[in-house]
Swiss-Prot record:
<keyword id="KW-0611">Plant defense</keyword>
<protein>
    <recommendedName>
        <fullName>RPW8-like protein 3</fullName>
    </recommendedName>
</protein>
<feature type="coiled-coil region">
    <location>
        <begin position="125"/>
        <end position="147"/>
    </location>
</feature>
<comment type="function">
    <text>Probable disease resistance (R) protein.</text>
</comment>
<dbReference type="InterPro" id="IPR008808">
    <property type="entry name" value="Powdery_mildew-R_dom"/>
</dbReference>
<keyword id="KW-0472">Membrane</keyword>
<keyword id="KW-0175">Coiled coil</keyword>
<feature type="transmembrane region" description="Helical">
    <location>
        <begin position="7"/>
        <end position="23"/>
    </location>
</feature>
<keyword id="KW-0812">Transmembrane</keyword>
<keyword id="KW-1133">Transmembrane helix</keyword>
<keyword id="KW-0325">Glycoprotein</keyword>
<comment type="similarity">
    <text>Belongs to the plant RPW8 protein family.</text>
</comment>
<dbReference type="GO" id="GO:0009620">
    <property type="term" value="P:response to fungus"/>
</dbReference>
<keyword id="KW-0381">Hypersensitive response</keyword>
<feature type="glycosylation site" description="N-linked (GlcNAc...) asparagine">
    <location>
        <position position="157"/>
    </location>
</feature>
<dbReference type="GO" id="GO:0009626">
    <property type="term" value="P:plant-type hypersensitive response"/>
</dbReference>
<dbReference type="GO" id="GO:0016020">
    <property type="term" value="C:membrane"/>
</dbReference>
Length: 213
């Protein structure tokens, strides 16, 4: 089966496995060029956990950045083609070997860049957790707004924290306040929503605040 057909329907993890197998075959054919191939194989081993996480998030998060995933697949497909072509070169063809070796080095650097995508992956997790919290909050707001407006005073403070083995998103402070001014014209309550959360892994704080009248 051609590499392009394998990559078309493959998850990123499977694409990495195809590349790993291609490197292994290339090293068996050319013992004198194992150094650059060992380096590329080590980079694949390093990014495999991250790629597995990207695969998982692409299935769970709606409207995930599909272009990023497709770009990574294309990069892995290119890597397989380079490695296979490099392995087929004859020993005497030094000029082509030099060119392919340089291209493999550049591609290996691009794959190492994928490690930096870890920051973006954590942001996807933060967004997923925030969407779940906002959905829960919207449900509570609907219940509140359906109540009568005759002198209702409601205040609730809630703090929760949730952690996982790879990402920890902590909601350090969430307050929902409804202040109702009783008047003769039957005015509706004012709702002040303030969400504050932080990521322990990246040590970043974020917050959202908006007011509904």
């Amino acid at each position: 089966m051609p590499v392009s057909e394998i990559m078309a329907g493959a998850a990123l993890g499977l694409a990495l496995q195809v590349l790993h197998d291609a490197i292994k075959k290339a090293k068996d054919r050319s013992l004198t060029t194992r150094c650059i191939l060992d380096r590329l194989d080590a980079t694949i081993f390093r990014i495999t956990p991250l790629v597995t996480q990207v695969d998982k998030l692409s299935e769970e998060v709606e409207d995930s950045p599909r272009k990023v995933i497709e770009d990574l697949k294309h990069l892995l497909e290119k890597a397989v083609s380079l490695v296979e072509a490099y392995a087929e070169l004859r020993r005497r063809n030094l000029l082509k070997k030099f060119r392919y070796k340089r291209r493999i080095k550049e591609l290996e650097a691009s794959l190492r860049w994928m490690v930096d995508v870890d920051v973006q992956v954590n942001q996807w997790v933060d967004i997923k957790e925030l969407m779940a919290k906002m959905s829960e909050m919207n449900t509570k707001l609907d219940e509140i707004t359906r109540q009568p407006t005759d002198c209702i005073c409601f205040k609730s403070n809630h703090s929760t924290s949730q952690s996982s083995s790879q990402n920890i998103v902590e909601e350090t402070d969430r307050s929902l306040e409804e202040i109702v001014e009783c008047s003769s014209d039957g005015s509706k309550p004012k709702i002040d929503i303030h969400i504050h959360w932080s990521s322990r892994k990246r040590n970043k704080d974020r917050e959202i605040r908006f007011v509904l009248k």
